[in-house]
């Protein structure tokens, strides 16, 4: 699931990138780590936060998924936004079936794609990469110190009234993922969205690392699912820095990591003084 989310974001077109330019700044890189630490401690000290997040997800996830299907995902078409309605209905009407669980997971993953594209558009690439690694470190610390499990159980158990679907976490068969686990994957996809080949390699790396990482479930009950994404990022960056990995942009050009940051993200540079 995470690998698919990594492969889905596409870069904003120049018009929208220019519109969002005024919002661009390093501070947005705090969002990944703040999202996991903030949610866990908010639920820990105010359990009603879980109920509020349940209703927030109920409203926001289908809308964000529709945006991904109609605009910000690879292969997006405006009419595909209607697919989100169908996925929501399947999730709602068949909540305990594999079809319902799969539809819910797709909605959550697609909603994260929208968030990943938008956040990567307003955050300098190098800072967002640091944010991904910081999120994985925070996730690992919370699990190792047993501070994540209890609040997470409260969040997973929270249900909206009226039999409406739970969209704040993902359950597919025996696999459970938190929303943040898909969010971090979307951030990785957003980082490389302008370099299709690198993005695809990052998705494959995420799948490979996660498959090996999951073997640890043989000896432990809880694992930070953000870690495989961060490791995939680090491996990709090592390949880019060593010149062994080069990616094509949407216009077909190739660039090394430093060239790409300098050339395709000129807004990161300090503008010349006004005269």
Identify the role of each PLM range.
Residues 1-275:
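A membrane-topology feature that recognizes alpha-helical transmembrane segments
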């Amino acid at each position: 699931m995470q690998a698919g989310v990594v492969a889905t974001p596409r870069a904003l077109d120049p018009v929208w990138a220019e519109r969002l330019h005024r919002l661009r700044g390093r501070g947005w890189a705090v969002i990944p780590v703040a999202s996991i630490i903030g949610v866990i401690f908010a639920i820990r000290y105010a359990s009603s936060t879980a109920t509020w997040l349940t209703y927030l997800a109920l409203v926001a996830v289908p809308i964000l998924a529709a945006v991904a299907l109609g605009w910000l995902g690879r292969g997006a078409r405006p009419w595909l936004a209607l697919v989100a309605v169908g996925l929501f209905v399947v999730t709602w009407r068949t909540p305990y079936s594999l079809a319902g669980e799969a539809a819910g997971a797709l909605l959550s993953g697609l909603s994260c794609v929208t968030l990943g594209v938008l956040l990567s558009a307003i955050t300098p690439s190098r800072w967002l990469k640091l944010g991904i690694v910081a999120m994985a470190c925070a996730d690992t610390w919370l699990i190792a110190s047993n501070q994540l499990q209890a609040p997470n159980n409260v969040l997973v158990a929270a249900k909206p009234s009226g039999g409406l679907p739970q969209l704040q976490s993902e359950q597919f068969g025996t696999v459970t993922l938190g929303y943040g686990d898909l969010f971090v994957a979307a951030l990785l996809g957003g980082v490389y969205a302008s370099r299709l080949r690198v993005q695809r390699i990052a998705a494959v790396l995420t799948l490979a690392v996660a498959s090996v990482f999951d073997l640890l479930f043989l000896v432990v009950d809880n694992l930070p699912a953000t870690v495989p994404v961060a490791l995939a990022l680090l491996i990709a960056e090592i390949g880019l820095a060593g010149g062994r990995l080069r990616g094509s942009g949407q216009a077909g050009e190739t660039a090394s990591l430093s060239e790409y940051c300098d050339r395709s993200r000129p807004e990161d540079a300090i503008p010349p003084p006004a005269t």
